[in-house]
């Protein structure tokens, strides 16, 4: 038996895959920031959860960033699957070897192709602009932040990607966004 909402979400993925993934990413980016803001505030017995202040503009910025991120990752997972299928044709290995090779190649491609492109051309520029950094300073921001970001990304995402690259392609954005939270 499917979880409540799973069938509807699967139908939306089938009918409007990019829109569904983009809106999902936006929602979960916003939710992640909401959780972060709640965890940043001091907790005391006298402070009820409903009395905590939330920076709605910040949540909105995260959600806007998530819209584009959903599109980027939707496109990436399709490209990565195409490259993986071309480089490791189905049936060329036993089923376990096929799964292992596909997962490893997906992770390598993501770390060395997608992440440098995504961080340099989307995430860092968008976050920088949202933070008020002038457009002319963005190349310096990328040069300054990209190397450490790629190293930290590999540390966090390599284990998660072992699972993500074994999820059906339609569901990978949701799986990835869930790890983001």
Question: Which residue stretches match the model-derived regions?
Answer:
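Short juxtamembrane and helix-loop transition motifs at transmembrane-helix boundaries
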Residues: 135-143
